[in-house]
C-alpha cells in the first residue's frame, strides 16, 4: 500500500513536471504575441 505522504509527494512532482513542460510553450506564445504586436 502506498503511503499518503508518498502519494502526495509523487503528485507534487508530477505537477511540477507538468508546469515545467508548459512553461516554455507559454513563454514562446507570449513572446510571439509581443513580437507580432510590435511589428
From Swiss-Prot:
Gene Ontology MF annotations: nutrient reservoir activity
UniProtKB keywords: Disulfide bond, Repeat, Seed storage protein, Storage protein
Superkingdom of this protein's organism: Eukaryota
InterPro entries attached to this UniProt entry: Glutenin
Keyword Transferase among UniProt keywords: no
Keyword set includes NADP: no
Functional description taken from the UniProt entry: Glutenins are high-molecular weight seed storage proteins of wheat endosperm. Thought to be responsible for the visco-elastic property of wheat dough.
Family (UniProt): Belongs to the gliadin/glutenin family.
Comment field (misc): Glutenins are coded by several genes on each of the group 1 chromosomes of wheat.
Assembly and oligomerization: Disulfide-bridge linked aggregates.
Name used for this protein in its record: Glutenin, high molecular weight subunit PC237
Organism this protein belongs to: Triticum aestivum (Wheat)
